[in-house]
């Protein structure tokens, strides 16, 4: 059951923000308190599966070859990078940066991981886009599908951070349930739960914001 205050805030933001000629992202601005963010244990680094997804298709890059690469492409991967192409990226950091900015996330067969870490870590690491390892017993199609509905909560060393919860053209109830899912995870992982939340606002990309916490 969606909390009325969250649903009301979502509806108000959508209704009162000027309409754009593109589908705006709906985000949460999360402000923490009473935490020493110099201590890694206090930093938020969580993946959350949203019940209603983000309302858009994520661009996923997959480092794979052979049958896994073919199945990744069939499952909707935007890019499938072979071992030969990985070598090319390692030799051309500008090309690697373009790919890193183009993709929302990456998945890699485990045998690719050491090479990626050594040659592309400097590009992917700071962007929070180091690949998710594809374990031998995991189906690439299922993994791609699950990641389409996933978001990362990453505070790094800051008390304030943002996370997307969907698109403006989504149903307000669906957006609200996505927000509740994120809030529930946050309260579980923070040292003092909701008492470590100074405030949380819902906002559109270029619109107004409304407080939900």
UniProtKB/Swiss-Prot annotation:
GO terms for cellular component: large ribosomal subunit. Pfam families: Ribosomal_L1. CDD domains: Ribosomal_L1. Keywords: Repressor, Ribonucleoprotein, Ribosomal protein, RNA-binding, rRNA-binding, Translation regulation, tRNA-binding. Transmembrane segments: none annotated. Gene3D superfamilies: 3.30.190.20, 3.40.50.790. Binds directly to 23S rRNA. Probably involved in E site tRNA release. Protein L1 is also a translational repressor protein, it controls the translation of its operon by binding to its mRNA. Belongs to the universal ribosomal protein uL1 family. This is Large ribosomal subunit protein uL1. The lineage of its organism: Archaea, Methanobacteriati, Methanobacteriota, Stenosarchaea group, Methanomicrobia. The gene is rpl1.
């Amino acid at each position: 059951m969606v909390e009325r205050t969250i649903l009301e805030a979502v509806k108000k933001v959508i209704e009162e923000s000027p309409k754009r000629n593109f589908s705006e992202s709906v985000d949460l601005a999360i402000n923490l308190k009473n935490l020493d963010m110099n201590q890694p244990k206090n930093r938020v680094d969580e993946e959350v599966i949203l019940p209603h997804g983000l309302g858009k298709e994520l661009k996923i890059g997959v480092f794979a070859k052979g049958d896994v690469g073919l199945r990744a492409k069939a499952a909707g991967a935007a890019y499938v990078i072979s071992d030969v192409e990985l070598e090319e990226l390692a030799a051309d950091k500008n090309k690697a940066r373009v790919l890193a900015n183009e993709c929302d996330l990456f998945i890699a067969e485990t045998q690719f991981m050491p090479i990626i870490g050594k040659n592309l870590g400097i590009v992917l690491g700071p962007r929070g886009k180091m690949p998710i390892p594809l374990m031998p017993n995991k189906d690439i199609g299922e993994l791609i599908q699950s990641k389409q509905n996933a978001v990362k909560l990453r505070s790094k060393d800051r008390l304030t951070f943002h996370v997307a919860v969907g698109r403006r053209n989504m149903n307000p109830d669906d957006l609200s349930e996505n927000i509740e899912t994120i809030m529930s995870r946050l309260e579980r992982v923070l040292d003092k739960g909701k008492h470590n939340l100074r405030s949380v606002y819902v906002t559109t990309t270029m619109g107004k914001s409304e407080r939900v916490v």
